[in-house]
């Protein structure tokens, strides 16, 4: 027994010596013991700007230092979802950038969703290599918290732009993405920036069985992305005869930091994105914080009193907009139940002891 103990102690000494030698040769932090170096137990996350998606992601938002892919069909709400994320990071005093490869950023729409466009870094690159070099520079600066690339399909290689119409450039974009992601993955992780790639869907030719849909830019992004979110447009939302939006499903098809395949059902309203009150209402109904009796919705407050919200979803959501205290209470209850970040104003409003819950500080985004 004593022999085994001395052998184990000797192994530990040799291991310590090996780690020190590798660090000496390759630099501090190049190799480390898991128990002494890396700590994934307290994963730094940034809220996505959509409460339903924060719940579906399992960790309360997008993890820092990771690559995220948001993909879907045309006009499904991909850019809207990314703009909500930009606005959320800016609320936490973060620095954000938008690489507009499609040259289609609607500044007024971004402003309506809460993005401070005066403080938004915007780039409209001429070709794919330039766009990815700009992303690399932003990441390596260590000051940009969130970078959105819209979109992968628009990252056209320089050779294709300079070539003639009809020239074959098979696999050029896929090679470009593969090379760029090999270079970006390490620097993104070290800088703690979040990079969101928006991607489009294409149909594979000749697929008889299985899903014929695929994303552009090859398969490298599928491998390097920590989280992949599919945005799928559903039934139209109508107000009378007019369509005012679409029911949209956000499905987490890949997740390296929590269980995947969870989904969020949200309302995408034209000109407003994903309204907070609609999102909270949908979650509250699903989790029975709001009771439904036929077409009527009611809510039981903290004092046990039943409050009627109205007949139908539209009237009930309008009631929540007119009564922000009830909306705040529902948001606080949902965030606490799912162990999500609770903003300061909700803690001060509903907790006597301000030390309870997860607080969001303006400095927290920069420190993590």
UniProtKB/Swiss-Prot annotation:
Q: Which UniProt keywords apply?
A: ATP-binding, Cytoplasm, DNA damage, DNA recombination, DNA repair, DNA-binding, Nucleotide-binding, SOS response
- Any GO MF annotation of the entry: ATP hydrolysis activity
Q: Which cellular compartments is it found in?
A: Cytoplasm
Q: Where does ATP bind?
A: 72-79
Its cellular-component GO annotations read: cytosol
What role is this protein assigned? Can catalyze the hydrolysis of ATP in the presence of single-stranded DNA, the ATP-dependent uptake of single-stranded DNA by duplex DNA, and the ATP-dependent hybridization of homologous single-stranded DNAs. It interacts with LexA causing its activation and leading to its autocatalytic cleavage.
Q: Which family does it belong to?
A: Belongs to the RecA family.
Name it.
Protein RecA
């Amino acid at each position: 027994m004593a022999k085994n103990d001395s052998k184990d102690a000797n192994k530990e000494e040799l291991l310590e010596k090996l780690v020190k030698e590798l660090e000496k040769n390759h630099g501090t932090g190049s190799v480390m013991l898991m128990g002494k170096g890396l700590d994934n137990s307290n994963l730094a996350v940034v809220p996505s700007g959509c409460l339903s998606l924060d719940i579906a992601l399992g960790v309360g938002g997008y993890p820092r230092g990771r690559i995220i892919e948001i993909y879907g069909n045309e006009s499904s709400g991909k850019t809207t979802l990314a703009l909500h994320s930009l606005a959320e990071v800016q609320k936490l005093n973060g620095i954000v950038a938008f690489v507009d490869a499609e040259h289609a950023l609607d500044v007024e729409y971004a402003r309506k969703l809460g993005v401070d466009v005066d403080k938004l870094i915007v780039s409209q690159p001429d070709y794919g290599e330039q766009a990815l070099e700009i992303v690399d520079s932003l990441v390596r600066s260590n000051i940009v918290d969130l970078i959105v690339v819209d979109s992968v399909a628009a990252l056209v290689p320089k050779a294709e732009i300079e070539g003639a119409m009809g020239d074959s450039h098979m696999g050029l974009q896929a090679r470009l993405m593969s090379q760029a992601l090999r270079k970006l993955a390490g620097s993104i992780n070290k800088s703690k920036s979040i990079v969101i790639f928006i991607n489009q869907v294409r149909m594979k030719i000749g697929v008889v069985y299985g899903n014929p849909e695929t994303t552009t830019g090859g398969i490298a992004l599928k491998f390097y992305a920590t989280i992949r979110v599919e945005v799928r447009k559903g039934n139209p939302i109508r107000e009378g005869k007019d369509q005012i939006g679409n029911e949209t499903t956000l499905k987490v098809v890949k997740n390296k930091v929590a269980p995947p395949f969870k989904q969020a059902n949200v309302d995408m309203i034209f000109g407003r994105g994903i309204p907070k009150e609609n999102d909270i209402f949908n979650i509250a109904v699903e989790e029975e914080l709001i009771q439904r009796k036929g077409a009527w919705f009611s809510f039981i407050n903290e004092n046990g009193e039943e409050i009627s919200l109205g007949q139908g979803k539209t009237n009930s959501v309008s009631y929540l907009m007119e009564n922000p205290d009830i909306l705040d209470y529902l948001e606080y209850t949902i965030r606490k139940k799912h162990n999500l970040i609770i903003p300061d104003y909700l803690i001060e409003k509903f907790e006597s002891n301000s030390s309870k819950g997860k607080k969001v500080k303006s400095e927290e985004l920069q420190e993590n």
